[in-house]
A protein has these predicted regions:
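Hydrophobic adenine-recognition pocket in adenosine-nucleotide-binding enzymes
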Residues: 156
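A conserved beta-strand element that flanks and buttresses the S-adenosyl-L-methionine
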Residues: 152
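Class I (Rossmann-like) S-adenosyl-L-methionine-dependent methyltransferase catalytic domain
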Residues: 2-148, 160-193
Length: 193
């Protein structure tokens, strides 16, 4: 009931008309201070994805998932796979595959994409699933990791609380995954747990 009331207060149509900096601060407040405290992570991230709260026209996964933002990474990943002899990538959270889909076109590796949002998993499976490409609903803070050589965890951890980051890293350490490739966002001077 509280979630419905809060959702009515922060209607997307209202937020979209605000200046960008105010919009992002309101969305951050809404998700980090209100939703994350009262709703399951799956509900929060499903709401973010369905309503395009990141406000990006190219990718529902947000501005960090655009082709421009990932250009260097897309060039570097094949080198990393060769250097570390990676045969299976576990990409979680995988998001909408906006940038990753180009690496999967002629993939010589096995790819497992995991995301907490079931709609994303279903859509990715329909559009990209094949013999060497699988998708699973997955919570990086709670679920046991599948067998893989590399966990790709890009632009995700800073959306979680410090305790959830620790849980994610504990799940990784409990797994047989050899390597982690992750990123963080250090541009937010106002971050609080």
């Amino acid at each position: 009931k509280l979630g419905n009331t809060i959702n009515k207060m922060f209607k997307f149509e209202f937020v979209i008309k605000l200046p960008m900096i105010i919009k992002f601060r309101l969305m951050r407040l809404y998700h980090e201070k209100i939703l994350f405290k009262f709703l399951p992570k799956e509900s929060v991230f499903t709401s973010i994805w369905r309503n395009n709260y990141w406000g990006n026209a190219e990718s529902l996964s947000g501005p960090g998932s655009t082709l421009v933002q990932t250009e260097g990474l897309r060039k570097k990943i094949p080198e990393i796979l060769r250097e570390y002899e990676v045969k299976t990538i576990f990409d979680a959270p995988c998001g909408d595959l906006n940038w990753m889909s180009s690496l999967l076109e002629d993939a010589s590796f096995k790819y497992i994409g995991g995301d907490i949002v079931k709609d994303i998993v279903d859509k990715n499976d329909l559009n990209f699933g094949k013999d060497n490409i699988d998708f699973i609903q997955f919570d990086i803070t709670a679920d046991p990791f599948p067998e893989a050589d590399l966990w790709l965890c890009r632009a995700a951890l800073y959306h979680l609380s410090n305790s959830d980051i620790v849980l994610s890293l504990e799940r990784f350490l409990e797994s047989n995954v050899k390597y982690i490739l992750t990123s963080n966002c250090i541009t937010d001077d106002e971050h609080v747990n």
